[in-house]
Design a protein with these regions (language model features):
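Glycine-rich phosphate-binding loops of nucleotide-dependent enzymes
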Residues: 2-257
């Protein structure tokens, strides 16, 4: 399988603190790849490095065959790499549909002058945007609430809306940071089904979370991070039975249980 994302020797230091140290992994086309670890393990820092929010202290990141190390988020989004954040990033006073339109900016915005004047190209771009909004809302089961204010949605649906905004740019790779944090088990199951539908549309995913049950039932491969370093890497079954993972999550006394 073709490697879509390649991370080699990734590191980030904050003063004397090594938040991420020598992470190396790859994500193939069409894969749901997981990164898990206890709170404070360095998962979100790794995502920030890959998505361009934070510059790495060392290492290399390649996406779709090109070196993208240190490139800013808007450049990566245009190349097909987008992400969500732990907290919901929706405009609460805008409708679900209006929120989705925001996500089309990078891929469909015609430029300042075409947008200012009513050109044929600008009209075509706006029409394409509306078509895409309707498609994404239908796809993620948000069409029935499209005209409601985002603030009126349950928290789980707001998380799905954040995913919809990121999908408006039709990324090749979508990174989801803590997609089920704060959700009930039923809401988490719904998010898992939504992620699978996204993958079925040909979009690869990197999912970052500390919910072991959720991740084991979703991802093909999982990287376990602890203190900013790789602790284990493999299939869900391999990492769930790894002694170092058991010790990190449950304590040393459970390793031989």
């Amino acid at each position: 399988m073709t490697k879509l994302l390649e991370v080699e020797g990734l590191a980030r230091n904050f003063g004397g603190l090594k938040a991420v140290s020598d992470l190396t992994f790859g994500v193939t086309e069409g894969e749901i790849f997981g990164i898990i670890g206890p709170n404070g393990a360095g998962k979100s820092t790794a995502v920030n490095l890959i998505s361009g929010v934070t510059r790495p202290s060392a290492g290399r990141i390649r996406f779709a065959g090109s070196d993208v190390t240190g490139q800013p988020p808007h450049v990566l989004a245009r190349k097909g790499l987008t992400r969500t954040f732990q907290s919901t990033t929706v405009y609460r006073n805008q409708t679900v549909r209006e929120n989705c339109r925001r996500g089309a900016y990078l891929s469909l915005y015609p430029g300042f002058l075409p947008a200012l004047f009513t050109t044929a190209r600008a009209k075509a771009m706006r029409a394409a945007c509306e078509d895409r909004v309707s498609e994404i809302l239908e796809w993620l089961d948000l069409a029935r609430v499209a005209e409601l204010a985002a603030s009126s949605l349950p928290y789980g649906a707001q998380k799905t809306l954040g995913m919809a905004i990121s999908l408006m740019a039709w990324p090749r790779l979508l990174m989801l940071d803590e997609p089920v944090a704060g959700l009930s088990a039923a809401e988490a199951d719904h998010v898992r089904d939504t992620i699978r539908r996204v993958r079925d549309r040909g979009i690869s995913l990197v999912v970052i979370d500390h919910n072991m049950r959720f991740m084991a039932n979703l991802c093909e491969r999982i990287l376990v991070v602890h203190h900013g370093q790789e602790l284990a890497h493999g299939t869900p079954q391999e990492v769930l039975t790894h002694p170092a993972v058991i010790e990190a999550y449950l304590g040393r006394k459970y390793v031989r249980a």
